[in-house]
């Protein structure tokens, strides 16, 4: 009987939820000595409850009679449910209604939607996975041989007709739609390349192909006329325009203080029909003859200081460069011819007042040296020693004035 406390403690620890009172625990005790053994067996079987379900409710151990505990009278609920489980599951499945959304899954919905979208939108010869305006079309991977053939065809013809498209589709193992889309993309790429090429090289191509005209320097305040083309001959009107511009520049130089005293004022009002001396040598537009040259020069100013007479377009200043070079450019034939150099005359009375020979003017021009009678036509850009003629003017009195030049009727 020493083991009974041990079993009581272990039974309480293992089955805390099934704690029994003392009256229930010892309900099977007998009156005799065998009752001790019976109480031991009953105690063990009550502690480990599955043995109670095997016994009958009215049976006792050791032949003794005792009170039957209510726990042993109860049947095991697990044994009752074990037989009725299949029946209850079948009844639950039969009573519940299964809706379509219960069977839906993400993978099943994708598999069911893909055939529905591709039906009715694919072309002949195209797989269902490629087509469909609503679905995403797969990217076509072209081989190098296909790209070479497509590029060759695009080089010769940028727009394909239907028979040629069918022929290329059969030859390259592609669909008509793939070839059509490739040509559309290739045309857009070609337009973009042409636009970039035209915008980048448009500004520099014009300057590289067209020759630039030579740079010319003009004095401030003068508006030069249109320059003639290098391959065309200058016309008469262009030469007249050039002579007018040169005469305007000569009139600008007339206002300089160093040359403001030439020509004398009494000669200006005495010859009203003659053009100004600065513009006489500028109206010639052809070969210059000695007679024309002699008739166009202005009278020698009676001055004691050696100053060149401003006759032409560009008169060389003492601080300027050579007389045949103006502003770094070679002088024109008209400029070189109009430039003359005179020797200083003998000192005499002041030319401001009218002299006794003012109305007569019977003296003739001085003679030129014999080696300067002819003016070569091909040496327009030669130095001043060849073109400019040196005159020996011998003015003895105030009345010795140069005769007026005749009218120029050939111009």
UniProtKB/Swiss-Prot annotation:
Biased composition annotated in UniProt, kind: Gly residues: 197-207
InterPro entries: HD, HD_metazoa, Homeobox_Antennapedia_CS, Homeobox_CS, Homeodomain-like_sf
Transmembrane segments: none
Keyword Zinc-finger set for record: no
Composition bias type Polar residues, residue spans: 67-90, 108-121
Transcription regulation is among the record's keywords: yes
Ranges for region Disordered: 51-90, 104-138, 192-377
Entry protein name: Homeobox protein HOX3
